[in-house]
From Swiss-Prot:
InterPro entries listed in its UniProt record: ABC_BtuC-like (IPR037294), ABC_transptr_permease_BtuC (IPR000522)
Pfam families documented for this protein: FecCD (PF01032)
Gene it is expressed from: molB
Chain ranges on the Periplasmic side, renumbered to this chain: 26-51, 114-116, 172-193, 258-264, 305-310
Places the protein is found: Cell inner membrane
GO MF entry, a single one: transmembrane transporter activity
Residue numbers on the Cytoplasmic membrane side: 1-5, 88-98, 141-146, 215-234, 276-278, 330-337
Name of this chain's protein: Molybdate import system permease protein MolB
Domain of life (superkingdom): Bacteria
Length: 337
């Protein structure tokens, strides 16, 4: 990437995101044209009278859903790219540390016992952070410097919680509880509102701000530990901080929209093709690409058929072939990340 091309790429991605978001306001059963959307937004900004139906559709249904999709997409993509950086492995994604499965079990447990919305949030977050604590505990117990051990612990916990989720599904009431559990696990923004958006936006803003401020340090994680230490950077604390922040993003995401896969794996690869591997430019680019991608997927989910398609189905259908194409191009170009 040429040094002067990064601002242009960033501006182009930002413009694409804004255009996609505006068009998304008009997509749905109650369709609106771009001029109509502009008139409604202008009327809202200038306190003019707005059609009650249009106001309800735009500001109470679609706008919080769009903003939630943007934040979730940016958060998952950011989590994926920083984890790939600290593990020095392009195949790592947020699921690898077990937080997704732990949070999913917490949410499934809440639905199984009929908890309220706040109970669902609390259970999901507690099990997500509990899983993260177990990863830290076992990693320190065995070998805190071994990245392989950390991955193995995450995989073990992920498998355990996935089995527990399956057990709860097996014993759930097939008339009421099971459909709710299955739909929630597949991921959706159908129930998005301002309350859920605020619940996710606060930790998203905090975690993403810290990770962006650490972007130059993330470049040092590609160095040997002795070389990084010579430069005055302590690898272990930085690595644990990044894992904690990434896990926090994932746990909060699962709480509001269920389990969504492939985003944290695919988007970092697409972003590297645009701006390279320097985390100072890669992180903002990845967040913009992730936000736009998630918004496009959600548009397809709510407009392709009368019944809304779960997000995780679409991300897998798009992500798996796309990842195959990326791997083929990397191999053909002789690249080896």
């Amino acid at each position: 990437m040429q040094p002067d091309s990064y601002p242009k790429i960033l501006f182009g991605l930002t413009l694409l995101l804004v255009i996609t978001a505006v068009i998304s306001l008009g997509i749905g059963r109650y369709s609106l044209s771009v001029p109509q959307i502009g008139q409604i937004l202008w009327a809202k900004a200038t306190a003019l009278e707005i059609d009650p139906v249009q106001q309800q559709v735009i500001f109470q249904v679609r706008l919080p859903r769009i903003l939630t999709a943007l934040c979730v997409g940016a958060g998952l993509a950011l989590s994926g790219v920083v984890l790939q950086g600290i593990f020095r492995n392009p195949l790592v994604n947020p699921h690898i540390i077990g937080v997704t499965s732990g949070s999913a079990f917490g949410g499934t447990l809440a639905i199984f016992f009929g908890f309220s919305l706040y109970g669902l949030f609390t259970s999901t977050i507690l099990f997500g952070f509990g899983t993260l604590a177990l990863v830290f505990l076992f990693s320190f117990k065995f070998n805190q410097r071994s990245l392989l051990m950390l991955i193995l612990i995450g995989m073990i916990l992920s498998g355990l919680f996935s089995a527990l989720v399956s057990l709860l599904q097996y014993i759930s009431d097939t008339e009421e509880k099971l459909p709710s559990i299955v739909f929630w696990l597949m991921g959706s923004f159908a129930t998005s509102n301002w309350e859920k958006l605020l619940f996710f936006f606060v930790p998203f803003l905090l975690c993403s701000s810290i990770l962006l401020s650490l972007s130059w340090r993330l470049n040092l994680l590609s160095l040997d530990e002795k070389e990084a230490k010579a430069l005055g950077v302590k690898m272990a604390p930085l690595r644990w901080l990044v894992i904690f922040l990434s896990g926090s993003l994932v746990a909060c995401q699962v709480a509001i929209s269920g389990s969504i896969g492939w985003v944290g794996l695919i988007i970092p690869h697409l972003s590297r093709m645009l701006v390279g591997a320097n985390h100072q430019s890669l992180l903002p680019c990845t967040m913009l690409v992730g936000a736009t991608y998630m918004l496009l997927v959600d548009n397809v989910a709510r407009s392709l058929s009368d019944a809304e398609i779960p997000i995780s189905i679409l991300t897998a259908l798009i992500g798996a072939p796309l990842f195959g194409v990326l791997v083929y191009k990397l191999k053909r170009g002789g690249m080896n990340e």
